Structure formats: structure tokens, C-alpha cells
Amino acid sequence: MKKNILIIGYGNIASRLHAILCKDSYKIYGISRSKKRGLKNFIKWDWLSKDLPNIQCNNFDSIIFIPKPTNSHQAGYQEGFLKSSENTFNFLEASKKIFYKKFITISSTGAYGLTTRHESYLDESSNIVPMFTEENPYPGDEVDLGQYIIRKYEQNQMRRYRNKLIILRLSGLYTSKPISKNHLHRATAAKIIKFFIENDFDFSSPEIFNCTEDASLFVGEKKSSYGNISNEKIKKLGFIFD
């Protein structure tokens, strides 16, 4: 029997993932605002609206959530990460008959802020900023707004999905040529998601994984530098970077 996969935010990475998943093993459902080429089981939904999507299937092996800022400003990040994830959780809660084993949420190594501030390697345990609570709701001045929103988004997802949650922090995505010192090809991003779909690790708590290529020399327009975000955790789990 095929396993059902729901992708919320079906775009470029999702289409790459769809292309490499075994068609005999998985049935893909994709949610986006507009119909996508090659996607048979399409569900139209604007995740910023209060309307609920109409989903006929109610049993999924994995749900993949791929957020995207609506623009590069504060409001765009708040809508793309915070509002969209809140509305997604609300619709899953409203649809109490929807079952899923894993919730894979895509995040960003932007959670570390400007990595040029850090001299050493950053890993998932790095104490980059204080955890935000009701008593400590806002970061200090040294934390950029994008970092704050991404960290807030991750914390919200942990609270919502608990041990079903896998957070994948993708570094600077590229298609043909890296443009940032910490980078990840879009095809590799799809392979990483596939890896977590195909393997059941039965984590007892939410898990975060940095998804970035090995820290090889990156040559930019003005200077050369090495990536400083560690990918050791995901490699120890068994993922192999090409």
C-alpha cells in the first residue's frame, strides 16, 4: 500500500522531491495557491486566509511544511513563517480526523543570524540567542529581526508538534552556483527531505538538523571564506552529501 505524503507549500523544492520519490511507494498531495505542473493531487489553499483547505485524504505518513516569506521585509517574514504556520496548525487541529506520523518543517540557518558574527562552527546546540518566553518575549538589539522571527517560528512548531517534529535548517539555497558561504543545492535539499520521509527514527523529542554542504572554500565577489555551520549531526544519522 502506498504511503500518503502531504506537502504544504508546493514549489520548486517540493517538485524536486516529488520527482525522486518512488511512485510505487508514495502518493503525493500538494497544497499551494496555484496549480503546479505535474501535480495530480492538487489542493488549492492560501495559507494566509482563514478558509480551510478541502483535503479528502486523512491519513499521512509525513507532512512537509515549506514556508516562504511573502517579501524581504518584516511583514513578509511574519506572514511567511509565523502566520502561515499558525494557520496550518489551526486547520490540522480543526480537521481532527487527519493522522500523520511525522511533521517535517523547513526552517533556515538564518536562525543563527549573521554568521559573520561567529568565529567558531555553529551546530544545533549552539546557544545563539536566548529562548523566547512570555517573560522574555523580545531579543536584544544584537539579534536581527529575521533571526528572531525564524527562532520564534521554530519554537512555535516545537510546541505544536512535539516528538513528531523534525526541523530542517536549510542554508543558502542555490541552483547552479553558491552565493553564500553556507550553502545547499536545491536538489540536495530535496534529497534530505526524502531521507527523513523514507527513514523512521522514532525521535522522542523535536529534532533540529542543519542542512548545509561541507564547509569547503567559497569564493565570493569580494573575499573567500569557509562555511561555519556544522552538518555533522545529519551525517551521523546517515545522510551522505554528494
Where are these regions (language model features)?
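Conserved N-terminal Rossmann-fold NAD(P)-binding element of oxidoreductases
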Residues: 5-9
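N-terminal Rossmann-fold NAD(P) dinucleotide-binding loop
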Residues: 14-15
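SDR active-site strand-loop-helix element
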Residues: 31, 66, 103-109, 168-170
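Conserved Rossmann-fold NAD(P)-dependent oxidoreductase catalytic core, especially the SDR/UDP-sugar
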Residues: 89-141
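Active-site Tyr-X1-5-Lys
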Residues: 129-165
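Mid/C-terminal beta-alpha module of Rossmann-like enzyme folds, strongest
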Residues: 189-232, 236-239
